[in-house]
Amino acid sequence: GKIDELDVKGTCDYAAPARAIYWGARQIMIEVGALQPGDVVDYEIAKKGFTYALLTAGDEDESRFIPPMRGQFYDIVPFWSNTPTVRKVYVVSIPMEKELQFQFYQGECASSMRYEDGCKKYSFVMNDMVPFAKEPNMVDLFDAAPKLMMSSTPQWKDKSLWFNKVNEDYGSFAPLPEAQKKVDELVKGKNTEMEKIAVLTHWVADNIRYSGISMGKGEGFTLHNTKMNYTDRCGVCKDIAGTLISFLRMAGFEAYPAMTMAGSRVESIPADHFNHCVAVVKLSNGTYMPLDPTWVPFCRELWSSAEQQQNYLPGVPEGSDLCITPVSSPENHYVRIKADNRLAADGTPVSYTHLTLPTT
């Protein structure tokens, strides 16, 4: 056989397809030509610093690679493929003074750690990977297929404390006079804490449109401030949750942001396997109640029943471990059937059936 080297200068840089979230993502593509049976595509991807930072193009300034949580590294590496793969190798090098915890889930791989060039070098290898078999309505592949999770952060509480501080320092939930006027209007005549929480949650859910426009460097873990959200009346989940947190605080509640993963499990390794931002509010009994205004527009729920047994991490000042939402009570999801079957005098069967479903 022979080896054909592809010139990476021939890559094409395109705007990535986007819907509802327009954060300027790019996709880099290259044509490899027609492949014949037995051909193998061998490629290597090098990454530096943070794995999800929405970095913009520019000069090779090292500050571009500083992660939001400074000094910390994590990665989530799928070890499955949609195409037959001869060999996959993942290597990460970290400074000698750093510690890294990891775990391989739902499969096996060859792993090692070596001291090389003044660094710790971790390697993970899997051979002869075949496409993972899928089933109708199955769980997310991250919950079933082989994956590697790693993080230099010791525990979830550290991430919780950082998430709280980065948004409090930024002033994400600072009060706004015109928003305060709306809050006062909404809670007027509401006597219980749940009445107030409900009316604020549903106003935000129904009035902040889901449409994310990039605001530049602040995208990521930092929630946009009250003025921007209330003025624009649009944003992604973090903007909708941030608006609710601001409203709750202006109504006298203690509320904070939380990160969650809609659709799959979050592991005990504190790698940021999150795709969604929600809110938590402290009730009078001292417990935190999760709220998701993004998922409850024009319905009666405060936390979508589609998000049962879902992991989330509150960014609270005392710090928190990874939490999980409870199972929604069966009484909230009933189907009542009342049937009346009779025989008429002439022997004709007569049946009446009445179905009652919960309204949401």
Predicted segments, located by residue:
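Solvent-exposed beta-strand/loop surfaces of large extracellular or lumenal domains
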Residues: G1-I28, Y52-F73, Q103-G118
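Hydrophobic/aromatic-rich core segments of domains that either
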Residues: K238-S329
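Conserved small/polar residues in nucleotide/adenosyl-binding loops
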Residues: T353-T359
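Second-shell loop/turn segments in exported
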Residues: Q27-E31, V183-K190, T226-C234
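Short, conserved phosphate-binding/catalytic loop or strand-edge motifs used
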Residues: G216-N225, M261
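Short, solvent-exposed loop/turn segments at the edges of secondary structure
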Residues: A25, Q36, T85, D117, ...
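Secretory-pathway-linked proteins and extracytosolic
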Residues: A46-Y52, T56-G58, Q72-Y74, P78-G218
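Edge strands and adjacent loops of beta-rich recognition modules
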Residues: I21-Y22, D321-I337
